[in-house]
């Protein structure tokens, strides 16, 4: 079967408007296309909705690290595991603003603030809202990931100037119970709905390499693509090994071609969403990242650290994008830098 012979019935084809009724068989058909056909379809749709030679650059800061009561089996910040990550208090406003300013000057267009909470307390949310407003004044897009939200909390974040709320589903509904027991998948879906109803854009994706099967990876994409509205940002994370967490017993970094196929299927199923090549890039070769961009990834995190794990150095990212002829805010930062 080649790309031209793919048929999904009901009048659907790969040139249709975004859909919300993807089936398992359709997802499997896409994933199993010959590699060249899959990449061709993904790149064709990518060009229809995005500049194929531009990548979004975001920066992620942990404003409150560790001590999280959730038992996510991959996470170094869970209080359930002896990962070596020390719990910290919520950062001061001025420290967050200064970090955001440096991120902007280094080439970030979006600044994401993460706190290791099950859900924010109102007194802490007051402080986060103040941070959001201040970061927004720097000319950056704002994103936050703070755990579960009530409808009122989502509205408060929106009113403070927050653009995006991140709350990942992590994996398929079927595999979910193998990695998390303290928060249900429905809890996550409810928080996404609260964010959407408050007027926030949604950032939602997952992790591959936790010990799941290909069917689980596709199930995660189906869950996202069949939401009432597609997430505006879809981060695809690759498992990062951290000390003393349960998934280390079964997790394995995915085959590189499998990662590219996931990116391509995400691009096809959610053609207007930004697909972020997220955690795990420090393990990827330049060639693998180039294939992911070709398959439809168009966002990365810049900065040497992602929460508690490493990330490629910004200079390496800038050099790679330059070699590929891909533009980003890193170009503006380079042009503005004083000569040596």
UniProtKB/Swiss-Prot annotation:
Keywords: 2Fe-2S, 4Fe-4S, Biotin biosynthesis, Iron, Iron-sulfur, Metal-binding, S-adenosyl-L-methionine, Transferase. Residues 1-21 are annotated as: Disordered. [4Fe-4S] cluster binds at residues 68, 72, 75. SMART domains: BATS, Elp3. Its cofactor is [4Fe-4S] cluster; [2Fe-2S] cluster. It is an enzyme of class 2 (transferase). [2Fe-2S] cluster binds at residues 112, 143, 203, 276. InterPro entries: Aldolase_TIM, BATS_dom, Biotin_synth/BioAB, Biotin_synthase, Elp3/MiaA/NifB-like_rSAM, rSAM. One of its GO terms (molecular function) is 2 iron, 2 sulfur cluster binding. Residues 53-272 form the Radical SAM core domain. It catalyses: (4R,5S)-dethiobiotin + (sulfur carrier)-SH + 2 reduced [2Fe-2S]-[ferredoxin] + 2 S-adenosyl-L-methionine = (sulfur carrier)-H + biotin + 2 5'-deoxyadenosine + 2 L-methionine + 2 oxidized [2Fe-2S]-[ferredoxin]. It comes from the Bacteria. Binds 1 [4Fe-4S] cluster. The cluster is coordinated with 3 cysteines and an exchangeable S-adenosyl-L-methionine. Binds 1 [2Fe-2S] cluster. The cluster is coordinated with 3 cysteines and 1 arginine. The keyword Metal-binding applies. GO terms for biological process: biotin biosynthetic process. The keyword Transmembrane helix does not apply. Its EC number is 2.8.1.6. Pathway: Cofactor biosynthesis; biotin biosynthesis; biotin from 7,8-diaminononanoate: step 2/2. Signal peptide: none annotated. Homodimer. Belongs to the radical SAM superfamily. Biotin synthase family. This is Biotin synthase. It comes from Nitrobacter hamburgensis (strain DSM 10229 / NCIMB 13809 / X14). The lineage of its organism: Bacteria, Pseudomonadati, Pseudomonadota, Alphaproteobacteria, Hyphomicrobiales. The gene is bioB.
């Amino acid at each position: 079967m080649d790309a031209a012979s793919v048929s999904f019935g009901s009048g659907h084809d790969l040139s249709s408007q975004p859909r919300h009724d993807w089936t398992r068989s359709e997802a499997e058909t896409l994933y199993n296309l010959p590699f060249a056909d899959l990449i061709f379809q993904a790149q064709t749709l990518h060009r229809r909705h995005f500049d194929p030679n531009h990548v979004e650059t975001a920066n992620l800061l942990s404003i409150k690290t560790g001590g999280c009561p959730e038992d996510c089996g991959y996470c170094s910040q869970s209080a359930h595991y002896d990962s070596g990550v020390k719990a910290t208090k919520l950062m001061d406003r001025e420290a967050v603003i200064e970090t955001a300013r440096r991120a902007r000057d280094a080439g970030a267009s979006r600044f994401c603030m993460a706190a290791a909470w099950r859900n924010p307390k109102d007194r802490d949310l007051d402080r986060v809202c103040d941070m959001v407003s201040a970061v927004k004044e720097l000319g950056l897009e704002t994103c936050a990931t703070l755990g579960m939200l009530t409808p009122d909390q989502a509205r408060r974040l929106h009113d403070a100037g927050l653009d995006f709320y991140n709350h990942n589903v992590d994996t398929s509904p079927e595999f979910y119970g193998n990695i998390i027991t303290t928060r249900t998948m429905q809890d996550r879906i409810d928080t996404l709905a609260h964010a959407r109803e408050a007027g926030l854009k949604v950032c939602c994706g997952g992790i591959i390499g936790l010990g799941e099967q290909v069917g689980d990876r596709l199930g995660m994409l189906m869950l996202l693509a069949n939401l009432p509205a597609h997430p505006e940002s879809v981060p695809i994370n690759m498992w990062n090994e951290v000390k003393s967490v349960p998934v280390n017993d079964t997790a394995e970094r995915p085959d590189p071609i499998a990662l590219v196929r996931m990116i391509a299927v995400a691009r096809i199923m959610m053609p207007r969403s930004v697909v972020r090549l997220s955690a795990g890039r420090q393990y990827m070769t330049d060639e693998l990242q180039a294939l992911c961009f070709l398959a439809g990834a168009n966002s990365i995190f810049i900065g040497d650290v992602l929460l508690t794990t490493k990330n490629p150095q910004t200079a390496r990212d800038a050099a790679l994008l330059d070699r590929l002829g891909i533009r980003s805010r890193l170009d503006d930062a380079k042009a503005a830098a004083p000569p040596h």
